[in-house]
Amino acid sequence: MQLQLQHGRPADCSGRLEKEIRSYDFLDSLGISYYRLDHEPAMTMEICAAIDESLGGLICKNLLLCNRQCTSFYMLMMPGDKVFKTKDLSAQIGSSRLSFADGKYMEEFLDITPGSLSILGLMNDKENRIQLLIDEDVLKSPFIGCHPCINTSSLRLDKEDVVQKLIPALNHEPIIVQLPTYEA
């Protein structure tokens, strides 16, 4: 798969979804510089590996989680190579019985479909229904990769821009968590 890294938004946004264009508008309004890769839908690990290599940054695994009653929701950003075990996270955030949230909540709260979950979706969560959780290892990388609310493009953002500009503008104060690394 041959991928070409481009700086900023596409020159021609025709044929792109409104939620993708909103992502570029939001980043541009914050003065955040970014690089973009357009690609086929990132649904397999092979595609994700090629994207990771081309972006040259950490692609986050983003999970939408909820408690058993579906009254508390969490978006977890973690390195793609880490294994997620609910027990490792539950105690840190004081929520038992975490599970993966139904895709309908992604669409309802974030205007994102499964496979496209991204920190940029939080710009659509005006009621702050989702608590942002970030594994500490994500913050060790100089760059963070994410989707512009659609999984046919990936962005590389400077970690400092994410921490100092993007997260404050999203109005979602993150909780930093420590997820263990398991041996394969």
Locations of the language-model features?
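Extended, low-hydrophobicity, polar/charged segments
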Residues: M1-A184
